[in-house]
UniProtKB/Swiss-Prot annotation:
InterPro entries xref list: aa-tRNA-synth_I_CS (IPR001412), aa-tRNA-synth_Ia (IPR002300), Anticodon_Ile_ABEc (IPR033709), Ile-tRNA-ligase (IPR002301), Ile-tRNA-ligase_type2 (IPR023586), M/V/L/I-tRNA-synth_anticd-bd (IPR013155), Rossmann-like_a/b/a_fold (IPR014729), tRNAsynth_Ia_anticodon-bd (IPR009080)
Gene: ileS
EC main group: ligase
Alphabetical list of HAMAP family matching this protein: Ile_tRNA_synth_type2 (MF_02003)
Span(s) of short sequence motif 'KMSKS' region: 591-595
Motif ('HIGH' region): 51-61
GO biological process: one example: isoleucyl-tRNA aminoacylation
PROSITE patterns: AA_TRNA_LIGASE_I
Residues that, per the record, bind ATP: 594
GO cellular component terms given for this protein: cytoplasm
Source organism of this protein record: Thermoplasma acidophilum (strain ATCC 25905 / DSM 1728 / JCM 9062 / NBRC 15155 / AMRC-C165)
Name recorded for this polypeptide: Isoleucine--tRNA ligase
Length: 1026
């Protein structure tokens, strides 16, 4: 038996079967390895944002990895050599430690210390790769084409050594410093956080808001009204702060006198009398009495000071300041040179027996403190205040602002450079450049780098008892200083390293900090290559990296820290392009979370949905817009594109094998439909290449859906009879050649987005390479493009779609010939001739607008007219409805209004509608503004022809059910009602030719299939002709 040139696929083949077949093929043929080793004349530097593998990958990770893969595959096909096409794993930090704490049942840091840092860190090391196999399995299933054999891992000594080099560089340049200050602090994790970590954890909460009266030390029966949303800080009050330029009033209310911002007095007091006004600067220096007599106020406190941060938008215009618990407060305390009152321990509990709430978590004490204030007549007003408050982005505990020693990177000193280098980055979406990301850069704060924790990259700072400091930048430097380098650079082993101080000779020990894990991931640019200790990384050519992408929250996470570190280390931006991805929501549009029970894990979902269908869905709309994860939408998008292309390929392969078609390049006969489709292919290639280059991958998907619609519902529907024609002339060769050309182009253009399906089509078309992913991305050929022809054919297609819609609206089947179609608009007669078979009408006429079977009808727009005309509105409406709409339109056109019985109606008060002749149904094409009319009347001849076509369709369905080849001849038996019998007698030859029937016999035989057509019973049986 002769082998088939083109594989004929089972009609029931699914995308799941295709994906599985191609994945097996790739593994059998080592396709990934061949992609990885593919050369190129241009360099593309990739950087994978490292996830932590101690948790399962969710559906959002699948989307991120899909977009990374699209970029990699496209650039491989466009002659780029991909540098560092590897994965990465983030290994350190609170996320890992918290999972370890859960495992052991720990709740405090002291429990970890008692258990043993060595054992704790060993568990952290083992746990981080718990789900790495699942991550790699998801990467396989989704088609992520990276080399996991070369993954960078942030816990490796080489990686951390590169970070040490960077930290020493920063220290030597004066950009890394230590300070005692108030920092964002998590009492659960007992460590400080950086500003970019804090930015990821804000929630809207309702906190108690209190207006408290502080008694003046110098004026009788006089008080300062201070406002706070943290009552727990009141025992530590040291100052009251006013804005020096704001206006304040001394008012009399409730039998006492109060200083308050002038604009806020009416909010705080229902009734008051203003005594006098002054500016905030006039209040500076005034003294007041301690509010709560529990702690000893330091010398120099309990006075009014100035602060420009005070506003009158809410509160009282006077802010209570506790320097221990606020950044602005601390700065005031520092400027005033006073000691700070801190009765709170590192667990966030009051830890001073003089305070009545000793031992209580500070935020839990708020209500008790309000009761105390009220009881002691210190409270003027109490309410709930909704505001945005920071929570630990890892453990969800409310943060405190707390005084600590900490190491900082002086980001504020390079703020101008950060903003300048941001201008070099191509952002998708572009509004992030000067929006969410750019605004954050413009307010960049010094980076709180140190963490008082256990599992992380150790801070390489050694100090002696005399305060001398040595920053180490490599393992060799430790040896040179006389220390012994441990095999593992983590705690507790690195803590045991000692050496003599090069300045005074005393023993030096390491400061017991690890660094922010964001510094780990932000160092991937260079540390993944063990820079500068190995020579496989060149900052001149490898920075900036070409492209990065992660979820929207990383604009203040990984995107930010990459940019900061590259600016400091290499004096340039970290990346050329960045694409930010929005969240995948559940089917109801809710954000997914474990607590809601609506999380979707990638592996589970990929076991239900074919990967190409999911990948296509991810780009069904811009990736920076959120999407509801809806299987119905996924199936619909897949059906309209991939399944439609599969059916087109099936049609092509079946017929091409019958005619023994062989691809020998594009061979066109001049047929207008072929020229149109070939032009469409090249337009599709051009627009898709532009979209890939601009990172608008959703535009490729949109263009592909339009292309598939043009190919299947327009080109193939109008061309299919050419494939069925006897013989093999130039016109038939041109049709095969065009269809092959279109299918192959689709497989190559869509290869980065739907890699499995594209390779399936490409391989079955007999592509030259082992995989479409080893092909070059197609180039468009401008000599084959005809924009005028495309426009004319697109207009014709829009007419066809409009006629289909009018048929459906008027219950006229597509196989029923219409008596007449009238078309008014910009259309060519020659194009109508090309598409008239699809329009299925006895008569098709191009007419002028003034020949349309339509009249204009005028009416009032009641929403506009009624308020003006009032009681006369019904009379005027009756009159305008009786007028000729054309005359109303003429008056408006000539005079700018229409006048009825002395009433002047402006154009916005009048609605003019087009009302078709009752014999016609009318609509306008969605594009191009072409008017289309179909005659709704069906005469007897047209009705009988429609019945004949219905018979043909049923016989063809039965041929398909019997798996007959197109060339198989049949004998057809029919048992018909009178109308169908009349239709058969009139159109017998047509029915024979369409169904390959040698003869049609009207009789009753065994095994006939019953159909109901137009309410009439029709029985059919077909036999192979002998």
């Amino acid at each position: 038996m002769q082998s088939l040139r083109f594989r004929q696929i089972d009609p029931g083949m699914t995308l799941r079967e295709i994906d599985s077949e191609i994945l097996k093929y790739w593994k059998d043929k080592n396709i990934l390895e061949k992609i990885l080793s593919k050369g190129g004349s241009k360099k593309f530097v990739f950087l994978e944002g490292p996830p932590t593998a101690n948790g399962r990958p969710h559906i959002g990770h699948a989307m991120t990895r899909t977009i990374k893969d699209i970029v990699l595959r496209y650039n491989t096909m466009t002659d780029h050599k991909i540098y560092r096409r590897v994965g990465g794993w983030d290994c350190h930090g609170l996320p890992v430690e918290l999972e370890a704490e859960k495992h052991f049942g720990f709740h405090t840091k002291s429990e970890i210390v008692n258990f043993g840092v060595e054992k704790f860190n060993q568990y952290c090391r083992e746990s981080i790769f718990r789900y790495i196999d699942e991550w790699k399995q998801v990467d396989d299933l989704i088609g992520f084409s990276i080399d996991h054999n070369g993954d960078y891992i942030t816990l490796r000594n080489d990686y951390m050594e590169s970070e040490w080099f960077a930290l020493k560089t920063m220290y030597n340049s004066g950009l890394l410093y230590k300070d005692y200050t108030v920092v964002p602090y998590c009492p659960r994790c007992e460590t400080s956080l950086s500003s970019h970590e804090v930015a990821q954890g804000y929630k809207d909460v309702k906190d108690p808001s209190v207006y408290v009266r502080f008694k003046s030390a110098d004026e009788e029966n006089t008080y300062f009204v201070a406002w706070t949303t943290t009552p727990w800080t009141l025992p530590s009050n040291e100052f009251l702060v006013v804005n020096p330029d704001m206006e304040y009033s001394l008012v009399e209310a409730q039998g006492s006198r109060y200083y308050v911002a002038s604009s806020r007095a009416g909010y705080i007091f229902k009734e008051y009398r203003e005594i006098r006004r002054m500016h905030g600067r006039d209040l500076v220096g005034k003294r007041y009495l301690q509010l709560m007599p529990f702690l000893d106020p330091p010398s120099g406190s309990l006075k009014v000071v100035a602060g420009s941060f005070v506003t009158s938008e809410d509160g009282s215009g006077i802010v209570h300041a506790a320097p221990a618990f606020g950044a602005d407060d601390y700065q005031i305390g520092k400027e005033e040179g006073v000691e700070i009152l801190n009765p709170v321990d590192k667990n966030g509990r009051f830890a001073d027996p003089r305070i009545p709430w000793n031992g209580k978590f500070v935020r839990d004490a708020n209500e008790d403190i309000i009761v105390y204030l009220k009881k002691n007549q210190m409270l003027l007003k109490s309410e709930k205040y909704e505001h945005s408050y920071p929570f630990c982005y890892r453990c969800d505990t409310p943060l405190l602002y707390y005084p600590l020693d900490a190491w900082f990177i002086a980001v504020s000193r390079i703020r101008d450079k950060l903003v300048e280098y941001n201008e070099r980055i191509n952002w998708k979406p572009d509004y992030l450049k000067h929006g969410r990301f750019g605004n954050f850069l413009g307010e960049a704060k010094d980076w709180n780098l140190s963490r008082d924790r256990f599992w992380g990259t150790p801070l390489p700072a050694w100090r002696c008892k005399n305060g001398h400091l040595v920053f180490v930048g490599s393992r060799k430097e430790i040896e040179d200083l006389g220390g012994k380098v441990p095999e593992d650079l983590h705690r507790p082993y690195i803590d045991e390293v000692r050496f003599k101080c090069p300045t005074c000779g005393e023993e030096m020990s390491r400061e017991p900090y690890v660094i922010d894990t964001w510094f780990d991931s932000g160092s991937a640019t260079y540390a993944a290559s063990h820079y500068p200790f190995e020579k496989n990384f060149d900052p001149e050519t490898d920075v900036p990296v070409s492209f990065i992408t992660e979820a929207i929250d990383q604009t203040r996470g990984w995107f930010y820290v990459l940019h900061v570190i590259a600016t400091i280390m290499f004096n340039k931006n970290a990346y050329e392009s960045a694409l930010s991805i929005n969240f995948i929501l559940d089917a109801q549009g809710r954000k997914m979370s474990k607590s809601k029970g609506n999380s979707v894990y990638a592996l589970d979902f990929l076991n239900e949905v074919p990967p190409d269908s999911l990948r296509l869905f991810f780009l069904y709309g811009a990736p920076w817009k959120s999407k509801n994860l809806d299987k119905k939408v996924i199936d619909e998008v897949s059906r309209k594109t991939l399944m439609t292309v599969l059916n087109v390929y099936s049609f092509f392969a079946y017929n091409a094998n019958i005619d023994n078609f062989q691809w020998n390049g594009l061979q066109l006969s001049g047929n207008a439909l072929d020229r149109y489709m070939v032009s469409k292919v090249n337009s599709f290639v051009r627009s898709s290449r532009d979209a890939y280059e601009s990172l608008d991958f959703h535009e490729v998907v949109r263009a592909s859906m339009e292309f598939v619609d043009d190919l299947s519902n327009f080109y193939l529907r109008l061309s299919r009879r050419r494939f069925w024609a006897e013989g093999f002339d130039d016109d038939k060769l041109s049709a095969y050649s065009t269809l092959y050309y279109a299918l192959k182009a689709f497989s190559e253009v869509m290869a980065p987005i739907t890699p499995f399906f594209s390779d399936f089509i490409y391989l079955n078309l007999g592509g030259d390479k082992e995989s479409v992913h080893l092909e070059a991305f197609p180039e468009f050929d401008s000599t084959l493009m005809d924009e005028k022809l495309e426009s004319e054919m697109d207009r014709a297609y829009s007419v066809i779609e409009t006629v289909r819609r009018l048929r459906q609206e008027n219950s006229i089947k597509g196989r029923q010939p219409l008596r007449e179609i009238l078309i008014a608009g910009d259309m060519e007669e020659s194009i109508i001739d090309v598409v008239k078979s699809e329009l299925n009408a006895k008569d098709i006429k191009l007419i002028e607008r003034d020949q349309e079977p339509i009249r204009l009808s005028a009416d009032l727009r009641m929403d506009r007219a009624a308020p003006v005309l009032r009681s006369r509105v019904n009379a005027v409406r009756h009159k305008i409805r009786s007028m000729d709409g054309l005359e109303v339109q003429r008056q408006i056109s000539e005079k700018g209004f229409v006048e009825i019985d002395g009433v002047r109606l402006d154009p916005d008060m009048v609605e003019i509608s087009r009302v078709p002749d009752p014999n016609y149904a009318y609509s306008q094409t969605e594009k191009y503004g072409i008017d289309v009319f179909i005659n709704k009347n069906i005469d007897r001849d047209g009705y009988l022809e429609g019945l004949a076509r219905e018979l043909v369709r049923r016989i063809q369905v039965m041929r398909k059910e019997m798996n007959l080849n197109y060339t198989d001849r049949i004998i057809t038996h029919l048992d018909l009602s009178d109308d169908f019998l009349e239709a058969l007698n009139k159109h017998a030859e047509y029915i024979k030719n369409e169904t390959q029937s040698d003869s049609i016999i009207t009789d009753k035989v065994e095994g006939m299939k019953l159909w109901e057509i137009n309410g009439e019973p029709v029985r059919i049986k077909i036999d192979l002709a002998r």
